[in-house]
């Protein structure tokens, strides 16, 4: 139900001490880290010009102007000093939870193709969380960490969803990785996990020095301007074309449009520093999946030029009684390129998991 947007006592998120944080974390930009780092300074200089000139296209908007991404009921939950948002539809059976990824323009809209399929063809309760800092949720000036977002997920499942016997989760990228860690710590909350293009099953990440993010955001307005430059419709289209979707499929217009919309919300650039520096990527992401005992399905695209992970660690999961691996000839968003096939494979897996046909590890 709708919660009053009143301030609640703040609970400090779990995290490492500052001394440990200063050592830096491993960033998950894979083998592309060097190429990305090489262009950051030039992009920052160009972006600063955007900030100085200003533009109606980069005008900041309140989150209330962001369109409803899923055509579902949208509610807000007070937590710590903030409020986060989630979508929901009532139904029968075990709740089905969708978790979007973490990136420069992330929101629940990323899960739209699968959500629409389950809306039409299933009677199950459907819920989709929007992480703090993204979508309709508050975008505060805080340090964004895996621990903060895992705590948010735990709070939502415990206090709002309140599942009996756990929920079935469909998570994208880091959304799946956070769910895997929570499934290990709180097996009572998560019955099964479908991980679409999960983070943590590839090669060891290349470290991105923290100095890059500090250099970028020294001048006033550079963080916002750099973000604005990266999230114009034209820039999002080029990135999606070159990095996410296969040429045969192309780039969905709605994917670009909604990404540009959410990027214009006030505070949208605040998680960017933590994302680029690698602080949002769990150090033990691989272990989170290896330690899972619940039914786990991994869905990923096999077109190497259009994915963010190498998935070299999948061999350690394959063959386990609780794991099913589904490779598809797509880019980094298989549920966009082949929504019908992904729906069928996911639906079949969840049905078998419900019947106990997928054995726990």
Where are the regions that the model predicts?
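Hydrophobic alpha-helical topogenic segments used for membrane insertion/localization
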Residues: 28-57
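Catalytic active-site module of serine/aspartate enzymes centered on a nucleophile-bearing elbow/loop
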Residues: 320-361
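Active-site loop/oxyanion-hole signature of alpha/beta-hydrolase fold enzymes
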Residues: 122-170
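Gly/Ala-rich beta-loop-alpha elbow adjacent to hydrolase catalytic centers
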Residues: 171, 175, 179
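Conserved loop-alpha-helix segment in the C-terminal half of the alpha/beta-hydrolase fold
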Residues: 291-330
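Conserved alpha/beta-hydrolase catalytic His-Asp/Glu region
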Residues: 204-206, 229-288
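Conserved HGGG/HGGXW glycine-rich cap/lid loop of the alpha/beta-hydrolase fold
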Residues: 88-136
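Flexible "cap/lid" loop of the alpha/beta hydrolase fold
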Residues: 184, 192-224
């Amino acid at each position: 139900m709708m919660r009053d947007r009143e301030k609640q006592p703040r609970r400090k998120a779990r995290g490492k001490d500052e001394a440990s944080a200063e050592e830096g974390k491993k960033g998950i930009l894979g083998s592309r880290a060097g190429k990305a780092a090489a262009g950051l300074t030039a992009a920052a200089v160009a972006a600063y010009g955007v900030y100085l000139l200003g533009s109606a296209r980069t005008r900041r908007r309140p989150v209330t102007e962001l369109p409803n991404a899923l055509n579902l009921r949208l509610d807000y939950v007070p937590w710590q000093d903030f409020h986060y948002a989630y979508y929901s539809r009532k139904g029968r059976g075990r709740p089905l939870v969708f978790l979007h990824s973490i990136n420069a323009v992330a929101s629940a809209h990323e899960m739209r193709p699968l959500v629409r399929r389950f809306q039409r063809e299933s009677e199950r309760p459907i819920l989709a969380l929007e992480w703090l800092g993204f979508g309709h949720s508050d975008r505060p000036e805080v340090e964004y960490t895996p621990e903060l977002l895992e705590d948010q997920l735990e709070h939502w499942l415990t206090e709002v969803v309140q599942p009996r016997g756990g929920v079935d989760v469909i998570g994208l990228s880091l959304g799946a990785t956070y769910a895997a860690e929570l499934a290990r710590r709180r097996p009572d909350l998560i019955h099964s996990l479908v991980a679409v293009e999960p983070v943590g099953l590839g090669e060891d990440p290349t470290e991105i020095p923290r100095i890059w993010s500090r250099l970028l955001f020294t001048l006033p307005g550079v963080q916002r301007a750099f973000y604005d430059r990266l999230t114009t419709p034209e820039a999002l289209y080029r990135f999606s074309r070159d990095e996410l979707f296969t040429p045969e499929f192309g780039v969905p217009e709605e994917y670009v449009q909604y990404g540009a919309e959410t990027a214009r919300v006030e505070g949208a650039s605040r998680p960017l520093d933590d994302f680029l520096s690698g602080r949002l990527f769990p150090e033990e992401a691989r272990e989170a999946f290896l330690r899972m005992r619940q039914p786990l399905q991994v869905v990923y695209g096999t077109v190497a030029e259009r994915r963010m992970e190498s998935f070299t660690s999948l061999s350690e999961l394959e063959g386990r009684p609780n794991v099913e691996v589904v490779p598809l000839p797509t880019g980094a968003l298989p549920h966009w390129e082949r929504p019908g096939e992904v729906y069928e494979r996911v639906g079949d897996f969840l049905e078998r998991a419900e019947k106990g046909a997928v054995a726990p590890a």
